Amino acid sequence: MSKLVLVLNCGSSSLKFAVVDAENGEEHLSGLAECLHLPEARIKWKLDGKHEAQLGNGAAHEEALAFMVETILASKPELSENLAAIGHRVVHGGEQFTQSALITDDVLKGIEDCATLAPLHNPAHIIGIKAAQKSFPALKNVAVFDTAFHQTMPEESYLYALPYNLYKEHGIRRYGMHGTSHLFITREVAGLLNKPVEEVNIINCHLGNGASVCAVKNGQSVDTSMGLTPLEGLVMGTRCGDIDPAIIFHLHDTLGYSVEKINTMLTKESGLQGLTEVTSDCRFVEDNYGEKEEATRAMDVFCHRLAKYVAGYTATLDGRLDAITFTGGIGENSAPIREMVLNRLGIFGIEVDSEANLKARFGGEGVITTENSRIPAMVISTNEELVIAEDTARLAGL
């Protein structure tokens, strides 16, 4: 029986897709539709070479998925005819979903109910699910939740110091994101260290335009930096991460900002974008560090925040840390950021191997600390698509 899974990841203005063999991890197709809802909406894909096409002015998720089915997959019948199931990345599952789920009407309603917790993401996921059901009515669909891995967090980690009834009645608590990536890295480290997953203690740094840190104890998430929403925690591309909540009142009451303006500022105009006042692109910050004030400022704040989180999470691991790991677009490719962060953690006896660190870029992986380092640091490429494909195959009965 075929175990080819179509993996879909619908963002607010993008659609990432892949066809993955859940049995051996082979990726037969990958692509990205981006700038959706804008005049420059386009789609790029890798299938027997690299390709790109314009989707048309204002094209949305439905048009992107239709192009993928009717043009890309249609050019490779052996792929489309052997698709066995569809897996969907879903950012927020609240407390309702502690693991991946076969999509039914009830599950779809549950995802819709969580939309207020991820207003940029969950509505897009719902569009993708419904479009996939329409395009492939015979295939089972599975939802794989970013929040599920973090449902093992203890109360001391997920509760906010707010009136308790806000949690009991409204579910206001820390949920965390990037769980699929944190889970994959945990499994990879177990293999690299020749340990059972249940014995692995790591601090994983998933660094991309969105970024989070996760403390993993005995193979389970015990704390993570993102909170009720993906806004909390680290400095990100356009998101502010941790701030004094009273800043919001000051912006509203003293400076006259509307709630909508504050929301836009914190989610789309802050982070590296806000600190540089130029761009959210980490490559600009890295390339101009020490030469341009705005780049230096942004990189220092980014690394300071990340190092503080890593250091703080050592307190959750009962005195044993097997490795610090870096993944995600920035984590896998930015040697300067990794070195700056690890150098700030010298109190833990960490020593960076600069040569190994430079080699661990653009697909390179491995240990980036010296043999004398008390704690190893590693670069590992994440593969969320594989985790989604494996869970989808399992729940679809493939």
Swiss-Prot record:
The similarity annotation says:
Belongs to the acetokinase family.
Q: What is the lineage of its organism?
A: Bacteria, Pseudomonadati, Pseudomonadota, Gammaproteobacteria, Vibrionales
Where is the protein situated, by its record's location annotation? Cytoplasm
- In its UniProt entry, the species of origin is given as Vibrio parahaemolyticus serotype O3:K6 (strain RIMD 2210633)
Spell out the disulfide connections. Answer: none
Domain of life, per lineage: Bacteria
Listed A to Z, the keywords are: ATP-binding, Cytoplasm, Kinase, Magnesium, Metal-binding, Nucleotide-binding, Transferase
The record's Gene Ontology cellular component field reads: cytosol
List the protein's name. Acetate kinase 1
